[in-house]
Amino acid sequence: MAPLHPHRAFWLIAATYMMVLFASAAPSPLYPVYQELWGFSALTLTLVFAVYVLTMLLSLLTVGSLSDHVGRRPVLAVALVLLIASMVLFVVAQDVGTLLAARALQGLATGAAMGTLTATTVDLQPSARIGSTIVGAAPAIGLASGVAVAGVLVEYAPAPRVLIYEIILGLFAALLIALLVVPETRERIGFDSRRHLAGTLAPQVRVPREVRTVFLASVPALVATWSLGGLYLSLGSSVVSRVFGVDNHGAAGAILFVFFACAALTSLFITDRPSTVKAAYGLPALAAGVVISLAGVLAESLPLYIVGSIVAGSGWAATFLSAMDNITAATPPAQRGQVFSSVFVASYLAFSVPAVIAGIVVSHIGLRDTIIGYVGYVLAMVMIAATFAVTMRRRATTAVRDSAEDAAAQPEPACKG
């Protein structure tokens, strides 16, 4: 079977990237259904959310850089097989135990896929602009469409508890078959020894020395954006139903969709801007958006909350893209799987840990006070990210000026003759 042209393969990988994230968000609108059906507590619901993140982080920490050694396609194939198996568990789930198993398996598969998919996207990108667009837009599009489509199906479709998983299962099966014609973008170099293999699979975050400064400077931006995404996906449904009185699953999903849809649209329009411009727009927009959203919650004004979600979603995309642009530019091709896996370790820790804490705290201090505390935390991370962005820009400007001065100071070569 002839391999696809790299440009076509790029779009197939982009679709897979979005589909993995779509599947990761799809169970969210079903959690209230499971809770009502099986009668488990809010703490158990938090555990269901946490087990997915924990297994995904374990996968990122162990097999995140595996594709740099064995090639991209084998890792993606195994991840898709595991994702299909997790969808089967969701379909047959009749109790919390099976639901936990399904979410845990999905976490393992998603962790194996994310760093590899990002690396493959960059490997195959027709241009840096298009690659940056997909890397920035895929999380927003995947998460937004997963929540929205699942919410509509839960509210209006037959067999609402299983239909979304059956659809995802079929799409993953099709993508697994299509993977056969995707060209390999990373030469299989294997491992020098068993010790090398064991060291690669040992749980750790690995960032090459030459990337470390840029990576660490980008972490606050990653934390700010993904923490806010975790807030929307973990407590967003509760805010919409308890604060604004929206009980329709489809409408609730559409309201949550606004945040991620605006992030996706912003990614399309801002992708060719320099990372400094993205940060200069994204960080203030992110801060303004969360403040407006909080004002909507406190005033119980749904229109104000939606406006805040629009502004915050736009800032989310620009901020995340700025961080990813900086990291991508600093990362050698042979280490993309390793570095991007580390990116998602930081991102998903930020996505999950505050959300889990909020899920525990909300029963003690109430939803509004929890949201106030969460927004304060996000704003603090935005301030830290802005400080790092300004510092890095000043260093870059100083380096360019010093280089120009050194060049000007060089004596002109004497003319011969």
Regions found by a protein language model. Give the residues of each.
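Transmembrane alpha-helices of Major Facilitator/SLC transporters
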Residues: 251-275, 285, 289
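Helix-loop-helix hairpin linking two adjacent transmembrane segments in secondary transporters
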Residues: 133-180
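Conserved MFS/SLC helix-loop-helix module at the cytosolic interface between two early adjacent transmembrane helices
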Residues: 57-96
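C-terminal transmembrane helical hairpin of 12-TM major facilitator-type secondary transporters
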Residues: 278-321
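A late C-terminal transmembrane helix in Major Facilitator Superfamily
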Residues: 316, 324-370, 374-375, 385
